[in-house]
């Protein structure tokens, strides 16, 4: 019976092209079915590990690790940039962030000649404005582009500091190991913006007193205007600019009551942490991981296993838990193809970055070979914004 169910589920989606799956990244990672991973690599201040598992028909999670100069000037400062972009409504916004966020950060770092919270904030703003310009240009012919958005988590290691900026519900968790006891302690550095959090609902209600329905409990899930769970994001322009909440936008996306100021924000919450010797690593992941494990569970897994392949291990544990919740075997879950797989778990992206205390202490002038890695999956062609893409078109584009 279970075998028949697997065959039915696999038949619901078009065949996956292995060439298409591998074409999304040339960063040295490996592909096993819907799982992409880079078991190990080196950044300016230590080691890293990355993994991505796809659940959606088109991968909505995007991610990158950039290490080397954090400025458009070769003189530095030097450091490591990590980005996890969890898209919703399609992959267009997260793909756009992946292509532009780091370049904006380098530009503003060059202008200020240093890394700072203000630099990161400006990079978020410039990325948001860039995507807004695309929506403006395409709205009449592709109105649904206004409904696509992405959470955005950025971590920057530079000059002995760890900057964590977040808009949405991805999460960055610091692993600290106490030298006396050897115990690992999890510290969440990112603030989350999800309507399921009471403080977020209170913030929204205070910002929008004229909208009694600013947060609505719908099917036991709190949502902004009954539509979206996150209160901060890049994109989602139809909930930020009223001129994009009208025809030709589909009626199901249009609000009944007008609004004069943005209902969602793109401004990140930023934390700056001075790295200490007991700070051993940071886990940056989309909410697909955190749905299946706690901060402490994730930190314990990293602490108690080899660094090589640790991101893949975290993803595997999350998938095993997802299978357990559905009373099925992990081996059977892996047989379910993208698209249908989304009924069992979300896209999951995990990047684990380790800190070498000796390297961190040498500061932002530490030079090293430039490193640029992007997570992979079955994706839209580069620089293509096509919300109307059909499965047949997507397969054809990936094969070309």
Curated annotation (Swiss-Prot):
UniProt entry keywords in alphabetical sequence: Hydrolase, Magnesium, Manganese, Metal-binding, Phosphoprotein, Protein phosphatase
Q: How is the cofactor bound?
A: Binds 2 magnesium or manganese ions per subunit.
What does the entry list as the binding residues for Mn(2+) 2?
Answer: 86, 287, 346
Without the gene, what phenotype results?
Slight increase in hypocotyl length. Plants missing PP2C42/PP2C-D2, PP2C64/PP2C-D5, PP2C79/PP2C-D7, PP2C63/PP2C-D8 and PP2C68/PP2C-D9 exhibit an increased hypocotyl length, as well as an enhanced sensitivity to LiCl and media acidification.
Which residues carry the post-translational modification Phosphoserine, per the record?
Answer: 75
* TM region positions: none
The main enzyme category here is hydrolase
The PPM-type phosphatase domain covers: 47-355
Residues reported to bind Mn(2+) 1? 86-87
Enzyme Commission number: 3.1.3.16
* Keyword Protease among record annotations: no
Q: Which InterPro entries match?
A: PP2C (IPR015655), PP2C_BS (IPR000222), PPM-type-like_dom_sf (IPR036457), PPM-type_phosphatase-like_dom (IPR001932)
| A GO molecular-function annotation | protein serine/threonine phosphatase activity
What this protein needs as a cofactor is:
Mg(2+); Mn(2+)
Disulfide bond as UniProt keyword: no
Reaction catalysed by this enzyme: O-phospho-L-seryl-[protein] + H2O = L-seryl-[protein] + phosphate; O-phospho-L-threonyl-[protein] + H2O = L-threonyl-[protein] + phosphate
Which is a Pfam family this sequence falls into? Answer: PP2C
Described by its record, this protein's role is as follows: Dephosphorylates and represses plasma membrane H(+)-ATPases (PM H(+)-ATPases, e.g. AHA1 and AHA2), thus influencing negatively plant growth and fitness.
According to its UniProt record, which protein family does this protein belong to?
Belongs to the PP2C family.
PANTHER family documented for this protein: PROTEIN PHOSPHATASE (PTHR47992)
**Subunit and interaction comment:** Interacts with SAUR19.
Name recorded for this polypeptide = Probable protein phosphatase 2C 64
Q: Which organism is it from?
A: Arabidopsis thaliana
Which taxonomic lineage does the organism of this UniProt entry have? Eukaryota, Viridiplantae, Streptophyta, Embryophyta, Tracheophyta
Gene name, per UniProt, is PP2C64
